[in-house]
Amino acid sequence: MAWRVLWNLSSCDAVKMTIIRDALSTLTNTVIVPHSGWNNSSFDDDHKIKFQTSLVLRNTTGCLRNLSSAGEEARKQMRSCEGLVDSLLYVIHTCVNTSDYDSKTVENCVCTLRNLSYRLELEVPQARLLGLSELDDLLGKESPSKDSEPSCWGKKKKKKKRTPQEDQWDGVGPIPGLSKSPKGVEMLWHPSVVKPYLTLLAESSNPATLEGSAGSLQNLSAGNWKFAAYIRAAVRKEKGLPILVELLRMDNDRVVSSVATALRNMALDVRNKELIGKYAMRDLVNRLPGGTGPSVLSDETMAAICCALHEVTSKNMENAKALADSGGIEKLVNITKGRGDRQVQGDGAQGSY
């Protein structure tokens, strides 16, 4: 009964941080960790298979889902809570392995992880980030340079460029500088997290789970940091792009919005951009007004699709031609004529509940 009370209280913004401060550690250590089965080999197989039906676990993950939407400080404290991220991901892995894709517990875990994946580039320690020039190296881009550069001390010799094996990863082979056995908060952005999210996107029929999984990939692939580049490559490696494209056809506004923004972020990777332009252009255009999509979409979702089209066609003539060939130009012009007093705001690169 106490867990239900906390679940109800956690929906009130005024007390969320109080619950996090006073009860998060207790909730994690007495419910989440033991009931998830993570780090507890004494649980028998029958418990591991049926744990997701636990009412206590369902209510507590629902409470965490609410708490994770309380803002930056809430996210930071939850990420640093020992065993929390590990247990939530363990629940998802176990449910995926037992083909339980649609339970409320899975939904709560996915939506909590989506929120904890929000703004990682800005909220994790600065030492983990890469600047734009380093990101160019990571993605294998050449930048003009000279062997030496002038400085106030004479000529400064250019640092030796790292080998491609040291600073690139395209989804194949070991990831440079990344732990093979991530723990805690590192599990949020480790490329191994991509596969369970994609499995849920392919198998779940729960719209909230689909939105949360797409939103997690959306958040993880946003921004100019190396792990976002790794996630984009991992999605391609796991053949996740066709899964995302198929969900564009779904008759659910919020799912389509998350998927469209995830595709926009995936297109920051040059190879992903080529694939999305080649195989997803018609699906994106079909969701614009006047297309053959199943329903009329909200302004927010339409903006997400427009942002995806912008990124996919940016600096890519073949994709721009595909947009024109699929009738996208006319539909975009009609949007501007019909809604001349409205503008698409921002790029929607990340989102949380």
Residue ranges of model-derived segments:
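Extended, charge-rich alpha-helical scaffold/interaction domains
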Residues: 134-135, 353
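Short glycine/proline-rich turn/loop motifs
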Residues: 43, 174-181
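Extended parallel coiled-coil rod domains
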Residues: 50, 180-203
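Buried hydrophobic core positions in alpha-solenoid tandem helical repeats
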Residues: 6, 26-31, 45, 87-92, ...
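Alpha-helical solenoid repeats of the armadillo/HEAT superfamily
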Residues: 1-10, 17-22, 26, 35-69, ...
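Leucine-rich repeat
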Residues: 13, 229-230
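Eukaryote-specific, cytoplasm-facing alpha-helical/coiled-coil scaffolding segments in long proteins
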Residues: 88, 111-116, 135-146, 225, ...
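Residue-level signal for cytosolic alpha-helical hairpin/rod architecture
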Residues: 61, 72, 194-195, 228, ...
